Amino acid sequence: MSPIIHSLLDTDLYKFTMLQVVLHKFPQTHSVYHFRCRNLEDTVYPLVDILDDLNEQLDHLCNLKYKEDELQYLRKLRFIKSDFVDYLELFQLKRRFIHASIDEEGRLDIRIEGPMVQAMMFEIFVLAIVNELYFSRIKTDEVWAEGERRLQAKLELIQQYEKAQQPNDPPFLVSDFGTRRRYSFEWQKHVVAAFHNTVPNVFRGTSNVLLAKELNITPIGTMAHEFLQAFQALDVRLRDFQKAALETWVQEYRGDLGIALTDVVGMDAFLRDFDLYFAKLFDGLRHDSGDPYEWGDKAYAHYRKLKIDTKTKMLTFSDGLNLPKAWELHQYFKDRFQVSFGIGTNLTNDMGQTPLNIVLKLVECNGQSVAKISDSPGKTMTDNDTFLAYLRQVFQIEELDEAI
């Protein structure tokens, strides 16, 4: 079968920004990542049916290297350092670090174990491969036509929103965050190009570096949960892991890439660590779980308490959004904050078929468990309930849901 991934740039920008910090600050870190499908009951056929094709695609993925024009593109990004690009010139994913199989319960199991400078780069590629293999078996012309109809409806809706904007209103800004859950690369490129060409004043960019390069648009992204989670197992007190992660980020980027992720141990615990120093240094915050209105109001109260003008800060929302949800949030917060929206599945896999809700998350670092305690029930992630309970205790977080 033909390869799904053709370029190592076909991933999200934050993989490069996080990898650069890992390479510079803790390159010897060992990590384990584990795959989960959160909606197995919704699949049309068992995911294990794609196993042979998946292994073939992984073989191909691990033969890819960065091309010279790709390296030159990365060098032009001001926050990417030259020694990091030199490292990428030699980079190749190693097949021995990733294993796809069937687990004891008959489910698709994917496990990545190896140096973090290798392991962390598999995630987006693997999720995109799983999605495309799954949907290619149930692909029809009618599905594509329905996707196109929905895409045109989205573009028309944005144009209505643009007309509703008052002359002095802050801009309504939307980005594509959909690589990991996309229907296919071809469809994602089609969607991103359509948004870029049709609503350029609203469409801010894409998280996909290859598409940003090919379409000459802005690549978007800063950090993901795995970056902060890794510090739970590094040489800092567990209570201080968030502060250590944010400080390390600041040391690396010196003011660039200033959107902090808040829900590794929940918003309340995050704000206890997000003191005046960090609140001034970081450009804003990203919401990825929990009630977005409650979250934004907490952020507003926190900045006000620190006597920081919230109109100088940005809130980025990226949790299960569609355009109407984003527009409502924009209306609610636009007079207090700069606001932007990262939309994933609803942009790149809204075809009339039920999307896969799949993740490939960091569960262990340097032999020690790590965990995410989400602001949303069902998004908490760990392989070790004992560590999860300890983490809750350290950060004074009540147990609201089961880890998955």
From Swiss-Prot:
The family this protein is said to belong to: Belongs to the NAPRTase family.
PTM annotation (Phosphohistidine): residues: H225
Function: Catalyzes the synthesis of beta-nicotinate D-ribonucleotide from nicotinate and 5-phospho-D-ribose 1-phosphate at the expense of ATP.
Keyword check for Ribonucleoprotein: no
HAMAP family: NAPRTase
Keyword list, A-Z: Ligase, Phosphoprotein, Pyridine nucleotide biosynthesis
PTM summary: Transiently phosphorylated on a His residue during the reaction cycle. Phosphorylation strongly increases the affinity for substrates and increases the rate of nicotinate D-ribonucleotide production. Dephosphorylation regenerates the low-affinity form of the enzyme, leading to product release.
Protein name per Swiss-Prot or TrEMBL: Nicotinate phosphoribosyltransferase
Keyword Zinc-finger attributed: no
Catalyses which reaction(s): nicotinate + 5-phospho-alpha-D-ribose 1-diphosphate + ATP + H2O = nicotinate beta-D-ribonucleotide + ADP + phosphate + diphosphate
Pathway per the UniProt entry: Cofactor biosynthesis; NAD(+) biosynthesis; nicotinate D-ribonucleotide from nicotinate: step 1/1
UniProt enzyme class: ligase
BP term (GO), one: NAD biosynthetic process via the salvage pathway
EC number: 6.3.4.21
GO molecular function term, any single one: nicotinate phosphoribosyltransferase activity
Cellular component terms (Gene Ontology): cytosol
